[in-house]
Amino acid sequence: MAHSPVAVQVPGMQNNIADPEELFTKLERIGKGSFGEVFKGIDNRTQQVVAIKIIDLEEAEDEIEDIQQEITVLSQCDSSYVTKYYGSYLKGSKLWIIMEYLGGGSALDLLRAGPFDEFQIATMLKEILKGLDYLHSEKKIHRDIKAANVLLSEQGDVKLADFGVAGQLTDTQIKRNTFVGTPFWMAPEVIQQSAYDSKADIWSLGITAIELAKGEPPNSDMHPMRVLFLIPKNNPPTLIGDFTKSFKEFIDACLNKDPSFRPTAKELLKHKFIVKNSKKTSYLTELIDRFKRWKAEGHSDEESDSEGSDSESSSRESNPHPEWSFTTVRKKPDPKKLQNGEEQDLVQTLSCLSMIITPAFAELKQQDENNASRNQAIEELEKSIAVAETACPGITDKMVKKLIEKFQKCSADESP
């Protein structure tokens, strides 16, 4: 549902009379998204360095719930392992979100200079686990753990970021069944839209561990939709290469397809790989220095960008500061293109799914309600179509239209 920008309410919203342009000084841009940008800034009242997300709510009106979700979760968090939220300001249609500035960049940025060694990985994973342990104790699920959403301070402190898809578990709703996250890092039970809990974050952590070791997640050379089909079907990914036994065992523990057998974040903090290899976070400043040297040597900004990173690091500019991930909001259809019919498929994305496919499956299941194996096969097919539609909106419409065209052609050919 579209919202009027003036009606937007988020935790920590400051008096609308306050002018953020007077309270804060924008410095260089450190990130860019579909509907806004992230700037390094100065709080003119305290001289504190902050990060300023500026979102155009008129452009992002269909994503306001995601924006509110991120701000709500961040405002409820009080942990040194989660990025701090300072408040929001509304000026016209622009929402200014003031957050903690972390000058070390994201783990994805730092990976552009090369994979991490096991001591660096263990140190970073330990801090991520502390963040997850905090979130899970607060009955929150991050749901999008990956290198792009792990930020570092210039001193090497590690914090979780990007809570646009984070979920809250209540006492009466212990498991969720919504389809969110990034395909390469997504747990099997999330893809299958089964009930899931905080153990989904543990799977994503295991994939992130492989990402830190290899520079990219498993299956990053494949199309995301194909990955959505393979993750539930295939055996879990394993860490291949010259790595220690304890590191491989850590990853295997995270990537158990049965979530009930995955350890909790608290249990993983006691894992041999973490206990024996993690160091003080200041050890991670070498990664930040390495990245600065790599940039200074004139490496192309596009060299390390890959389809598997969900485009977090695309659109980088040549500046000495690592860019922040800014994936809170997604691009919506262009109204002008809609008027011209150029994006008609986007408007009708779910029409065939809701009007034809879903009712057809319901009728099939009702007809065979006493045939358990047949009903199970129907449900699996229905889930697969839902997964395909989520990964590639509009694919169901195209399939149905193609089937109708084929049927009409066959009927015409058979006519006397």
Curated annotation (Swiss-Prot):
One of its GO terms (cellular component) is cytoplasm. ATP binds at I30, G31, K32, G33, S34, F35, G36, E37, V38, K53. One of its GO terms (biological process) is cellular response to starvation. The active site is at D144. CDD domains: STKc_MST4. The modification Phosphoserine is found at S4, S300, S304, S306, S309, S325. It catalyses: L-seryl-[protein] + ATP = O-phospho-L-seryl-[protein] + ADP + H(+); L-threonyl-[protein] + ATP = O-phospho-L-threonyl-[protein] + ADP + H(+). The modification Phosphothreonine is found at T178, T327, T328. The keyword Methyltransferase does not apply. Its cofactor is Mg(2+). Disulfide bonds: none annotated. SUPFAM superfamilies: Protein kinase-like (PK-like). Its main location: cytoplasm. PANTHER family: SERINE_THREONINE-PROTEIN KINASE 26, STERILE20-LIKE KINASE, ISOFORM B-RELATED. Homodimer. Interacts with PDCD10. Interacts with GOLGA2. Interacts with CTTNBP2NL. Interacts with RIPOR1 (via C-terminus); this interaction occurs in a PDCD10-dependent and Rho-independent manner. Interacts with PDCD10; this interaction is required for the association of STK26 with RIPOR1. Part of the core of STRIPAK complexes composed of PP2A catalytic and scaffolding subunits, the striatins (PP2A regulatory subunits), the striatin-associated proteins MOB4, STRIP1 and STRIP2, PDCD10 and members of the STE20 kinases, such as STK24 and STK26. This is Serine/threonine-protein kinase 26.
